[in-house]
Amino acid sequence: ETRELEDPAYSSNPTDRCYACKRELHSHLAPIAEAAEGARVLDGVNLDDLGDHRPGLQAASEAGVGSPLADLKIDKSCVRRLSKALGFPWWDKPAQPCLASRFPYGEAISHDRLRQVGHAEAWLIERGFARVRVRSQGLSARIEVPQERLAELLAPELRDALVRAMLELGFTSVSLDLEGLVSGKLNRVIPG
């Protein structure tokens, strides 16, 4: 079991939070690989991941983790095509980045807050919103779904149920992000 939440370099949620998380993860995986002679830790990083803000890649590199998909220049669309051809049932599963990415940088992360966001997203997924993010900003829940589905959340019955569910989870207000679901949105605050 990893303990990244016990590390302030992770739980304080700085812009390089992923570095602390991956460092912790790889510190647990390295001994397992060492115990299995000739084994090496590999990850699923693909070519598309290399263009985004990914401080965890540095921790993986430092730990000697291999990234065969990226090394072979395989991108996300290729991973999906190969997965479909191989009959994997999850070939078209939407990306689900770490729940810590739902919090603005600098806003502390805890087990309870991660659980709250996880339950909020599960509520929406159960209602057919496979691609969803619930961004936690203080006590507010900001809902992101693909732009073409925004209107569905404004239908009175679903809207009222959504607000009730978010309030029951401990949020004090609920808003809908009119820009829709945009990957990496929180990284806009990072200079460069």
For the regions a language model picked out, list residue spans one by one:
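Generic alpha-helical secondary structure
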Residues: 26, 110-117, 155-159
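C-terminal, charge/polar-rich interaction regions
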Residues: 132-134, 151-158
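Short, aliphatic-rich beta-strand segments
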Residues: 136-147
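Short Lys/Arg-rich amphipathic alpha-helical segments
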Residues: 149-150, 165
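Short, low-order "capping/linker" segments at domain edges
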Residues: 184-192
